[in-house]
Swiss-Prot record:
It is found in: Nucleus. A motif (Q motif) lies at residues 64-92. This is ATP-dependent rRNA helicase RRP3. ATP binds at A108, Q109, T110, G111, S112, G113, K114, T115.
Length: 475
């Protein structure tokens, strides 16, 4: 029988570990770690300038309603149906120039409306000259690729637009058949579309008119650089190119020079920053009580929409099981799940069937999750850029939000680096009273043991299934 979480009340009284002694332990441990291990690389330097060939425009309102753009009626009807009323800054800055046929480099965070900023001009152009393989949109993750396809499908619903999503983890033959149906819009991860360009007979992008690189900084962070180089060599040089990124780094500037021609740069935000309406804090915890503090926080924010970020797939899976055993409605999201499992988790969280999403950094950027109340950093991220993207999942579209980071004695170096980039110290939230925490710890310890057992059983069953399948094939 699943244990019901005890309702824990927040208090400023005695904590599990005295804050001063814990801080001293943290400092000692950090000095020890500094001698023993190399420091994690700093995030790539952000550059404030672009090449002389680019034209900078400010993010002031270029138009006030979509009806001012003289779009085709079918596209306008879809825009109205989707309730796009007032353009976002990136849409206002980019769309007019894109409709003039100019290359665009857009600097904007996830959730700024940038998908529509490139989809609307492409669909307007496609209406005037419909042909297959018209546009290729490259995305760093499968989830983002599916969401971009959904936006194209919704905006192109009255135009007869055919789109396809080409990502890893799906059957190559099925995808080849989809490509042979000659879709107008291809949304893909770089590695998989390159596989098809090299191996799928009859498929080429010689007639491509538009290339979009979305979340380009992340494409490069995830080592898609070589695949991007190959793609740029096999597509027409005479094309329109849009590059969207959260930040302007040296790598992005280099990619811009290699792929764009006299682009217009629209910068909504190109610095490390968090939203003004985001309340950020941290809790000093001892490593052995980390799960207990997590459950305490899930109790505190009962009924809220919560994303918990962990560092590894194993932590994500185990923390999800722990939360479920203790009666919480939680779903996992990480790279070792199948595509259908990942989409299933996302849909449950977005629809409210589960109010807790426990995830690796795959959920930090690019996912369309409309309303998140709280972000909990169960594991401190390894760089400040990842921290800013994680906490940026809440306090969006003018709403307020809360983020809490659990900091152990092993996290000080990373934590101090994050504070340095933020430019201020995160306030410390008080721990619950010692007796309440210890009582909760007993339940959490028991549930943790059960979660570990279930994880082990699952892996053993999966290994046995693989062995049985192999034996059947050999017979």
């Amino acid at each position: 029988m699943a244990l019901k979480p005890e309702k824990v009340k927040s208090s400023k009284s005695a904590s599990t570990v005295d804050a001063k002694s814990l801080a001293e332990k943290i400092k000692k441990n950090a000095l020890k770690q500094k001698k023993q291990a190399p420091v994690t690389e700093k995030p790539e330097e952000i550059v404030e300038t672009t090449s002389e060939a680019s034209q900078d425009v400010n993010s002031e309102q270029q138009f006030h309603t979509f009806s001012e753009l003289n779009l085709v009626p079918e596209l306008m009807e879809a825009i109205e149906k989707l309730k796009y009323t007032k353009p976002t800054p990136i849409q206002s800055g980019a769309i007019p120039h894109a409709l003039e046929g100019k290359d665009i480099i857009g600097l904007a965070q996830t959730g700024s409306g940038k998908t529509a900023a490139f989809a609307i001009p492409i669909l307007q152009s496609l209406w005037e000259a419909q042909r297959p393989y018209y546009a290729l949109v490259l995305a760093p993750t499968r989830e983002l690729a599916y969401q971009i396809k959904e936006t194209f499908d919704a905006l192109g619903s009255g135009m007869g637009v055919r789109s396809v999503c080409i990502v890893g983890g799906m059957d190559m033959m099925d995808q080849a058949r989809d490509l042979m149906r000659k879709p107008h819009i291809l949304v893909a991860t770089p590695g998989r579309i390159m596989d098809h360009l090299e191996n799928t007979k009859g498929f080429s992008l010689k007639s491509l008119q538009y290339l979009v690189m979305d979340e380009a900084d992340r494409l490069l962070d995830m080592d898609f650089g070589p695949a991007l180089d190959k793609i740029l060599k096999v597509i027409p040089t005479k094309r329109t190119t849009y590059l969207f990124s959260a930040t302007m780094t040296n790598k992005i500037a280099k990619l811009q020079r290699a792929s764009l021609h006299e682009p217009v740069k629209v910068a909504v935000s190109n610095k490390y920053q968090t939203a003004d309406n985001l309340v950020q804090s941290m809790m000093l915890v001892s490593d052995g009580y980390k799960n207990t503090f997590l459950i305490h926080l899930l109790n505190e924010f009962m009924g809220k929409s919560i994303i918990v970020f962990t560092r590894t797939c194993a932590h994500t899976q185990r923390s999800t099981l722990l939360a479920r055993i203790l009666g919480f409605s939680a779903v996992p999201l990480h790279g070792q799940l199948t595509q259908s499992q990942r989409l299933g988790s996302l849909n449950k969280f977005k629809s409210g069937k589960a109010n807790i999403l426990i995830a690796t950094d795959v959920a930090a950027r690019g996912l369309d999750i409309p309303s998140v109340d709280v972000v909990i950093n169960y594991d401190i991220p390894t760089d400040s850029k990842a921290y800013i993207h994680r906490v940026g999942r809440t306090a969006r579209a003018g709403k307020s939000g809360k983020s809490i980071s659990l900091v152990t004695q092993y996290d000080l170096e990373m934590y101090l680096r994050i504070e340095s980039v933020l430019g201020f110290k995160l306030p410390k939230d008080p721990s619950p009273p010692r007796d309440v925490l210890n009582a909760l710890h007993v339940h959490v310890d028991r549930a943790s043991a059960e979660a570990i057992k279930q994880t082990k059983d699952f892996h053993e069953k999966r290994t046995k299934k693989k062995r049985d399948d192999r034996d059947r094939e050999e017979r």
